[in-house]
């Protein structure tokens, strides 16, 4: 299996979507039946307009006592116009939030992981231009850590020793156990030892790297990989 380094490799392409006219009840059905936490709202042309989340739909129940005049102590006197709008909404166009967190198919997995953690969101919608082409969630990124040790070893051999460092395969060895890579053997230059560790750690699914490599010459060789 080739290294999956971009969103396009791991995203879910078959996305459950709603239209602006989708009813409240149908939205609830989508979330409950399909076991998703949010439904994107798209135009007839496929452009992403907004998203309806579980929290948006719960607004109706959360403020039911206020609507009935029961004086619910948790919400009475604290309702905003936005609260009332969502509590009374009957279609996706009035329920949805327009503030969206998005990415592109070409974004790298580390970039997406940073967006998810920084913004505290569960998912990012994937856009090609303005069109929705997929969704990437936290679990999609975590799934890369389920790659087998043998798959990871082959990936490290190829991307680190063959493609990047052009090392003699008789002088280097990568072994993997529970996602942790052990690098042993000898490279030509000191700088290549650090490069091997950095590149191995960048392979999707690698949990950690133990570097036990040696070198022949100090310093940086003429073909040392930069960056």
Regions found by a protein language model. Give the residues of each.
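N-terminal targeting leaders
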Residues: 1-37, 42-47, 51-227
């Amino acid at each position: 299996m080739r290294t999956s380094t971009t969103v396009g490799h791991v995203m879910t392409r078959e996305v459950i979507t709603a239209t602006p006219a989708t009813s409240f009840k149908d939205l609830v059905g989508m979330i409950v039946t399909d076991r998703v936490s949010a439904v994107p709202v798209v135009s007839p042309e496929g452009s992403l307009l907004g998203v309806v989340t579980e929290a948006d739909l719960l607004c109706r129940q959360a403020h039911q006592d206020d609507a009935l005049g029961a004086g619910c102590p948790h919400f009475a006197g604290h309702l905003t116009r936005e609260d009332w709008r969502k509590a009374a909404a009957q279609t996706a166009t009035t329920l949805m939030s327009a503030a969206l967190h998005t990415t592109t198919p070409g974004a790298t997995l580390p970039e997406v992981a940073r967006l998810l953690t920084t913004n505290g969101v569960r998912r990012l919608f994937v856009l090609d231009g303005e069109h929705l082409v997929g969704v990437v969630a936290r679990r999609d990124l975590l799934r890369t850590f389920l790659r087998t040790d043998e798959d990871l070893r082959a990936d490290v051999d190829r991307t680190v020793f063959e493609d990047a460092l052009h090392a003699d395969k008789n002088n280097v060895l990568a072994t993997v156990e529970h996602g942790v890579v052990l690098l042993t053997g000898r490279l030509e230059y000191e700088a290549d030892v650090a490069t091997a560790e950095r590149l191995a750690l960048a392979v999707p699914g690698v949990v950690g790297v133990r570097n036990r490599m040696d070198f022949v010459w100090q310093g940086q060789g003429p073909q040392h990989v930069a960056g």
